[in-house]
């Protein structure tokens, strides 16, 4: 697994709520690494590092290299980030160990490109995104950061399906998802509600004026 994003972490001696609170008082985020048929490892990391990854996007399918001083690096996925209910600051992170040659479930995001070239959108159609993510199984060495949906050739009423996505080589759809499932579509243009209401009001006013005694007929 080459080109992993490295995150600097520190080991923690104790687990539990009290130890986690103490870690937060030190300005760090408590975290755990589980899986791989090993005992969980209790770690901590800089909250700015996690926030950077959350804002970067694609973190749910990105394999990280967790590097602690004096320990072997660990390849892992972020499985859960708990956020403070008021500040949205990260307060705990769950990592899962991964190894090449195994299959893991991940949610991979979809990047939509070519919207400005779509004939349907040029004619007033609207992009209707059904899925922003797809659940797949993949070897950690082959997890894409995103799939690509090409919109440049789509007209009104055309769809993008799983089989149309680029970057799906080497991955398998998660259970319960069909290969012909719709990812996005170009919907027909709709009449602006305000314009429609204004036209109706104008027509009603003209009809009322025409019905008044003495009104001139055109």
Curated annotation (Swiss-Prot):
Keywords attached to this Swiss-Prot or TrEMBL record, sorted alphabetically, are: Ribonucleoprotein, Ribosomal protein, RNA-binding, rRNA-binding
* Any GO CC annotation of this UniProt entry: cytosolic large ribosomal subunit
InterPro entries linked: Rbsml_bL25/Gln-tRNA_synth_N, Ribosomal_bL25/Gln-tRNA_synth, Ribosomal_bL25_b-dom, Ribosomal_bL25_C, Ribosomal_bL25_long, Ribosomal_L25_dom, Ribosomal_uL5_bac-type
A molecular function annotated in GO for this UniProt entry is: 5S rRNA binding
Q: Which residues form a coiled coil?
A: none
HAMAP family in the record: Ribosomal_bL25_CTC
Q: Which family does it belong to?
A: Belongs to the bacterial ribosomal protein bL25 family. CTC subfamily.
The record's annotation in NCBIfam families points to: bL25_bact_ctc, PRK05618.1-2
Function summary: This is one of the proteins that binds to the 5S RNA in the ribosome where it forms part of the central protuberance.
The protein's assembly and partners: Part of the 50S ribosomal subunit; part of the 5S rRNA/L5/L18/L25 subcomplex. Contacts the 5S rRNA. Binds to the 5S rRNA independently of L5 and L18.
What name is this protein filed under?
Answer: Large ribosomal subunit protein bL25
Question: From what organism does this protein derive?
Answer: Gluconobacter oxydans (strain 621H)
């Amino acid at each position: 697994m080459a080109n992993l994003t490295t995150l600097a972490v520190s080991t923690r001696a104790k687990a539990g709520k009290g130890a986690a609170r103490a870690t937060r008082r030190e300005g760090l985020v408590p975290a755990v690494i589980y899986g791989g048929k090993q005992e969980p490892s209790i770690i901590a990391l800089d909250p700015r590092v996690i926030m950077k990854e959350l804002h970067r996007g694609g973190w749910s399918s990105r394999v990280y290299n967790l590097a602690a001083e004096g320990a072997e690096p660990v390849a892992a996925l972020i499985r859960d980030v708990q956020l403070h209910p008021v500040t949205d600051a990260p307060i705990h992170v769950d990592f899962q160990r991964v190894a090449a040659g195994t299959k893991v479930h991940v949610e991979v995001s979809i990047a939509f490109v070519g919207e400005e070239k779509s004939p349907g959108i040029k004619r007033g159609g609207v992009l209707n995104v059904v899925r922003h993510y797809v659940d797949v199984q993949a070897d950690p060495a082959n997890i894409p950061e995103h799939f690509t949906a090409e919109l440049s050739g789509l007209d009104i009423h055309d769809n993008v399906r799983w089989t149309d996505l680029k970057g799906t080589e080497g991955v398998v759809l998660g259970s319960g998802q069909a290969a012909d499932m719709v990812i996005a579509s170009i919907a027909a243009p709709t009449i602006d509600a305000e314009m429609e209401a204004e036209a109706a009001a104008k027509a009603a006013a003209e009809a009322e004026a025409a019905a008044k005694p003495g009104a001139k007929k055109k």
